[in-house]
């Protein structure tokens, strides 16, 4: 482990020096790549340096105990040694996690698709609740949110809503949200007071950059049509809505949120790139996925991952058996406890798998 940490520290210093090189500064692409690499190494190096400092302090404390000390001073040194040893253990555990293979998509922006599934109008209303929850979560994390496509219903729900979240580490925080979300509550329209169960599906895709997924004009077909509002009525007499079809894969994306055809096309292409990136990544990982499923659920939108129970004010994440009795605050975007536990679970499972393969 420590050989790897020394190599990481050496690379960090090399990258830091390169970022001061005038040739690098003048090359925007190279500068961006190196800045990203420096950022990805920084926490590991900072933690490793603190670890080395703590080890040095432990050696000094042990050396002091070999000297002639009065009882009070000896107790002080022993107390400090105990604290330093505990800190050393914490740092070792943290370094093991920091050296785990990183998800290359973690720092990417994301595109999120929410669809009302089983439950009709109630499912569409729940899709709107989830969208609001993610909006609040985005605000708390200083992520920029942009709606790319929406199909609202007459009663304030969404058959489907697609949006992007932009900001550092957006995918690392949102990637565990893919799957089926179940709600149990009494609908406002229910006179008998019976609890209904509905579901909405969420799909989280890392947003692909142009250089990662190239979309050739010859591979796409663009159709234009009049945009429609809730209930399907036409709200626009000009053909500003756009449908982009990727001919080789058959993947289709529609966008009608903007007033101009050009803006709708740009948004549709962003979603298409993300879907193509996901499509190609799944193809590449097909063999590996057959033997090693995702450590925190499959990420399949049909897999039930979480239940939101209104009568009990309860949120349960079924993948890790976590239950919180504070539904209202979670729906207000206070999702950190859920997400942190999912991340911790994934890291624990990764450590186990690495220990078995070592």
UniProtKB/Swiss-Prot annotation:
Cellular component aspect of the GO annotation: cytoplasm
Pfam families given in the database record: PCRF, RF-1
Main location: cytoplasm
GO molecular function, one term: translation release factor activity, codon specific
Sections of the chain in a coiled coil: none
SMART domains in UniProt: PCRF (SM00937)
Places the protein is found: Cytoplasm
Residues modified as N5-methylglutamine: 233
UniProt record similarity statement: Belongs to the prokaryotic/mitochondrial release factor family.
PANTHER family recorded: LD18447P
Protein name: Peptide chain release factor 1
Record lineage: Bacteria, Bacillati, Bacillota, Bacilli, Bacillales
Gene that specifies this protein: prfA
